[in-house]
Structures are given as C-alpha cells and as structure tokens.
Amino acid sequence: MLDAASMIMKEEIYRCDVGRFNSQTFAYVAAFGLFTDVSYETSQDLKNILGHLAYVLEGAKRLLDIKAYHMKVTTENGVIEDNFIYGMITNSRSVGGFKNLTKDVDMNDGLFEVTLIVQPKNPLEMQEIVRNLLNMEDNSDLIYSFKARKLTVEAEEEVAWTLDGEYGGSQGW
C-alpha cells in the first residue's frame, strides 16, 4: 500500500490497456459462460469459512448444467461464429487464480487476449478441452485463442457477463 501511495506521489505513471464493455470499463477480464458467476454468486459466509475452497465447491455445482451460447465474435482479423460454453477477453497473466491461461501478455500493447471455448459434442471432446487447458495448448478445434484490438460480440439470447469479477449485466444483441 505504501509503494502504491509513493508511486502516486512521485507521479510515476504505468500505462495499461483498459477495456470498454458498452458503458462500463474493465482492466482485468470480461467473461461469460461456465464458472464466470462463481466469484459473485459464492456466499460471503462460505468464503470466510472455506476461503478458496468455497469457489471450487461453487464451481463444481456448475458442471451439472453447462449452458452454451450461440455467438458471433467479430474482430479486425475476421469473424468466428459457434456455440460457446465460455469466453474471456482479458489483459492478465492469471484469471480466477489460474496462472498462465493466456500467453505473451503485454498489459500496454493495445491488445486483449481472447479465449473462446466451443461447446463439446460429447464427453471425449470435454476431456480434450480439459487436457488442452491443463497443458496450456490454447489453439485447437475446441478452443480459440487470439489477440484483438477490438471485438464485437453478438448473441441470440441474453448472456450474463462478469467484469473484473463482478456482475457486469446481461447482454443480448
């Protein structure tokens, strides 16, 4: 805390990318889908008692009801349209306590790291997704991973988003 105050007093400026989500901003992550509501849906009492394990237990409940969203994601490099169970636009080396989910992160390059996970069609594809995530193999037929300066996300239904770990509202286009 003292270091932060000292930096402010010295006017040392650290520039970093900030995202815009409609009328809101985010510095860390904008995400939808599987597990993204865990940070704000886990009860404070449970967090106080169990700490990080509270998030794990709350997340485990989500595995019984995996919802997919049909979306069209447009960037300066093209269009991706598919059914996704998870997506994140981030500017961080770790998300939700998981380190190195994104690679080659530069927090002031004007680019965001994007990860989109396609709805698996069967248990083998779900296993492949988990294996790829654990092995940090981020580009496959089931996981899109890329950098983008700007994204437009369109969905056929309302989709709940989290912005920097807080509820960011539901959007449909």
Language-model segments: residues:
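Gly/Ser/Thr-rich active-site loops/lids in small-molecule metabolic enzymes
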Residues: L46-A54, S94, K103-L124
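Accessory alpha-helical/coil subdomains and C-terminal extensions
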Residues: N48-E76, I80
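ATP/nucleoside-binding phosphotransfer catalytic cores, i.e., glycine-rich phosphate-binding loops
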Residues: T75-N77, E81, D106, L116-W173
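Small-residue-rich beta-alpha loop regions that form the catalytic core of phosphotransfer
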Residues: M1-L53
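Glycine-rich phosphate/pyrophosphate-binding beta-alpha loops
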Residues: A31, F35, M88-T102, Y167
